[in-house]
Amino acid sequence: LAARGLGRLKPLAQAHVEQVKLLAREGYYDGLNFYRVVQGFVAQGGDERGNKTIRTAAPFMQAEFDERIPRGLDFTPLGNPDGYADQVGFINGFPAGMSRRENRVWLTHCTGAFAFGRGNERDSAATEFYITLQPQRYLDRNLTVFGRVIWGMEHVQAIMRGEPGNGGVIVDRSKWTPIRSFRVAADVPVQDQLYLETFNTNSELFSELIEARRNRPEDFFYYRPDYLDLCQMPLPVRLTPNR
């Protein structure tokens, strides 16, 4: 599956970004599986039994649910009220929430968010990851989001689902979706790399696109609510020729 999908990491939650890079480079995820997949919720992967040895990465992570707003942060506001944050918008292609009252910022659980799972303890994340199949905004600031799927999300959506009565865990191991290869894109041989362009969310053109989605100009629409939900804003990505 990893050969078909590509995720992008953002330098918020930088410790988690470095953690998953270390795990990828030591081959931790190779041969593991997506074993818990809940329809309309998440696809979770990793070592379901917790038996695999971590060689170079940290055994546990300090939570980075949110962080202090960095100086000079480029934040493009969506421009509508939000039920989960004082303000929402985009940071370098990532949907994000912000509280200027608290001086905090975080990435949000829109579709395709890449995050680490954890137990009840705040700092119990280590290796288990999940990808959201639909928006799950109520999880914002409760788990650490540090990336998003930017290519191949259709393959994530096609992963075998588990039974709702078993918390989404797939009992039949033969139906698990294997992780054959999990790599940092920069480490992939040049001839095998994908070259993708993401829409510049700091641009005037993107602000115009936001407005066009907030009040759709097509003749089909008779009611225009002057509202846009954060997770309904498309973030265009396109494949470009190899350079």
Residue ranges and their predicted role:
Residues 1-243:
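Cyclophilin-like peptidyl-prolyl cis-trans isomerases
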